Every structure is written in structure tokens, then in C-alpha cells.
Amino acid sequence: VTPFLDTNVLVYAALSDDPRCAIAERLLAAGGAISVQVLNEFANVARTKLKWSWPDIEAMLTLVRSRSGRVQPLALSTHEAALVFARDHSVGFYDALIVAAALEAGCDTVLTEDMQHGRKFGALTIVNPFIESAP
């Protein structure tokens, strides 16, 4: 089953001086589902925090989309499911959107460092691929 890649995987893949870069690049090369939210969040981080130019952002997003097994849209059903996850599991709304999109994409794993490693949402498991390489 295809894993779902959270925004931080894309961000670390773009940071060549970060020890997590090599792991993130391998994950990105292997492919995985993402959502439109992940693309949007990366564009925002790349522009505001990394100070990338728009052409560089567009090039990275084109690369990400080409390697991704699937880009999950954000539909009303995603929004509604995220509201339920946020309410019932005490997670932030944007994390709940990631969970909802991953489930809609048919993923069994979310690769992220933003949620508790090993936490389960039904058949979906949160995995932090950066545990051993955190600075």
C-alpha cells in the first residue's frame, strides 16, 4: 500500500544541509500519495521561510507531483471527515485533514514528524521516518 507523505518530508528533501534530507529524498523518490494541502503548505513554507523564488517552488512541486503515486484532492468529504477526526481524536484540524486525505487515498501509513509516532487512526498508522536523524 502506498504511504502518504506529509509536508515536512517535502521540506526536508529541499534542505540539503539538514541531516533529514537524505531520508526525505529517499521517501520522495520511492513515491507516495500527497494531497493538495501538502502542495499548498510546501509552497507557503518554501516562499515564506526558505525564501525560494516562485520558479524554484514550481519546479519542486512539478517534481513532487511526478513522483507521487497520487495527489488527493480536498473535497467536502475530506473536510467533513477531518472535523470528526479533530473532534474525536483531539488533533489539530490541519493534521486531521492529512489523516482524512490519507484514508481517502487508501493509504495505511502517514510519514510525518508532526504527529505521534505509532498513533493509529483505524487502519492508518503515523510513522516518523526521521526519529533516528533528528538534530
Regions found by a protein language model. Give the residues of each.
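Short, well-structured N-terminal submotif of metal-dependent ribonuclease cores
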Residues: 1-35, 49-59, 133
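Acidic active-site catalytic centers that drive phospho-/nucleotidyl reactions
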Residues: 6-8, 41, 95, 114
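Structured helix-beta-strand junction loops
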Residues: 30-31, 67, 89
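Acidic, PIN/NYN-like endoribonuclease modules and their adjacent C-terminal/linker elements
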Residues: 99-135
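Active-site-proximal, substrate-binding regions of enzyme catalytic domains
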Residues: 41-69
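Active-site neighborhoods of divalent-metal-dependent phosphate/nucleic-acid chemistry enzymes
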Residues: 70-113
